[in-house]
Amino acid sequence: MKRFVILLLTAVLATEGFPAGLTEDDVLGVAIADDTVLVNFSAHMADAIRASRLNQRMMAYQLTGALVQRYPVRRVRFFFDGEAKNTLDGDVMWAGEFLMDYVLCE
């Protein structure tokens, strides 16, 4: 599952101008609890997202959409160095749960 998240970041999000210098070590862990995928990124990943011009909302929903379609889950939660961050200086509330948004996926 961790490998799948890494592939998503390198393939899908690379087209969005995702910051260089991130490695697979920036995905600290991925697990499923009940109907939720839990993704734990490094603090370095949080800093890279803050520093980039990346559309955080699109990133969150691209990852959510791919994970919900790939695994038998309904929700995704993101953590950075084990913590649920409210924001990364953007308009996304990272501390909450993300559900599949079929409108964004079209």
What residues fall within each predicted segment?
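Bimodal "functional hotspot" detector
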Residues: 1-106
